[in-house]
Amino acid sequence: MQYDVNKIREDFPILSRSVYGKPLVYLDNGATTQKPRCVVESITDEYYSVNANVHRGVHFLSQQATNLHEASRETVRRFINARSISEIVFTRGTTESINLVASSFADSQMKEGDEVIVSVMEHHSNIVSWQLQAARKGIVLKVIPMNNRGEL
């Protein structure tokens, strides 16, 4: 399958910007991702029409927001072919997700002296999550180095 990069870029309004006279390229997706137009429009629509606490109220807007939230969980489940919506956990971002995985895995599966191996190429949030678990539980963190050719 071949993708039309220019067509995809059109879906991301921020990528229409130029930086130093060249089209913007954004690769720091471990920190935050740029949102396609449909996501920005959907978030804006939510703020304008159904903004309320999810699972925290019995009033109309809260119920509507909760229904939309749970419908999105089902959409994600189908998209990634998960068996159940209980497998879908929404977090604020990658760092929180990695912290949650590292903490829950360390608590349920690891003991002092167990090893976790990461590469030097990991995003900072993944390294820090495991450093915290190493300090907390006595887990041994090993880092795979990279050679001069960028290989592990």
How does the language model describe each region?
Residues 1-152:
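Pyridoxal 5′-phosphate
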